[in-house]
Amino acid sequence: MAFYYKNNLGYQNIPYGYQLNDFRASFEKARTFDMEDDLEFCPSLSDEELVSIYQSTGLSPTSSSPSLSPMTPNLYPNVLPNVHPGVSNYTHHPLSGLHQNVGSRTRKSSGIPIIDPVTRAPAVLAGAVSSSRAKQMW
């Protein structure tokens, strides 16, 4: 008795480049579909509901168009404010005398500054602990 196996590979038969381009196109469409687009294409909302939503969110009905939805480069400002994370003194006390000069080095924090998208100013996090202080606590 012979058994025949049907090879169902699904997406594996489609070239990788096509899969990637298809994914990128659908991702870009989904990512740029904003609340404005939801309001424009939602037929179940009455005119009064639309007006109240526009007033509460500060959106204008004339700007809600899918052609005006922002693409990736327009989401972020071209020039970020000049933000310098604090310079912390990195002190290291080695157990052996082999690495004596390591303790005298000064190292900048490698953290990425968080920018408030509305004001485009550096966000200040309350209760944030620097990485050097966190290491000392452990």
From Swiss-Prot:
| Superkingdom of the source species | Eukaryota
Where does it localize?
Cytoplasm; Nucleus
Which Pfam families does this chain map to? DUF4452
Claim: Manganese is one of the keywords in the record = no
Q: List, alphabetically, the GO terms of the cellular component aspect.
A: cytosol; nucleus
Q: Which residues form a coiled coil?
A: none
User: Where is this chain primarily localised?
Assistant: cytoplasm
Q: Which UniProt keywords apply?
A: Cytoplasm, Nucleus, Phosphoprotein
Instruction: Tell me which residues bear Phosphoserine.
Output: 110
- The name under which this protein is listed is Uncharacterized protein C22H10.02
Organism annotation:
Schizosaccharomyces pombe (strain 972 / ATCC 24843) (Fission yeast)
